[in-house]
């Protein structure tokens, strides 16, 4: 009887371990892990978008400030320095620098050189304004993308919370079912065997007591 109880107890422990494995390795848990990965990727992308937006806004401020300072300044401008400055600005933003071969010629008089440099500045000014418009457009698109990404993140978080809640409900339901259909019957069977053992022991005790009485009666005879 004792061996049977031990066997049933071991079987019960094995079934409980299997239940835990089924709970923690369920498809719902795998889906949640995948959702967490997607959320992390989306958050990373949002941060990159915000950094890019800040960079573009800084570039626009620098470009706009440079143009306004140049156009509103009443002081004489160092044309050569301004051309080099604006060319560096264009190169930093992936644009080709604007130069004129004639400005390197020593055969031109001062007025001709001024005209050449003025032409370079006008072309640079046109390119800078074009770059400003492109930056504004990229900024608007980035802001739209950022807004869409934030809405997507909110949607995913809501879906994730719903999936987690559903997963918890299904897990609790599964545990209750396992407990009702397997654990309780095993406990009932174990208790039944215990009662049978107790009854068997009581019978043995009664038989032993009866046997002692018979021995006493036999000894008296």
From Swiss-Prot:
KW Cell cycle (keyword) present: yes
Stretch forming the signal peptide: none
One example of a Gene Ontology biological process annotation: cellular response to pheromone
Keywords: Cell cycle
Record's keyword annotation contains NADP: no
Recorded GO CC terms: cytosol; endoplasmic reticulum; endoplasmic reticulum membrane; FAR/SIN/STRIPAK complex
Assembly, per entry: Component of a complex at least composed of FAR3, FAR7, FAR8, FAR10, FAR11 and VPS64.
Function comment: Participates in the control of the reentry into the cell cycle following pheromone treatment.
Misc remark: Present with 1540 molecules/cell in log phase SD medium.
Name listed for the protein in its UniProt record: Factor arrest protein 7
Organism: Saccharomyces cerevisiae (strain ATCC 204508 / S288c)
Highest classification ranks of the organism: Eukaryota, Fungi, Dikarya, Ascomycota, Saccharomycotina
Gene that encodes it: FAR7
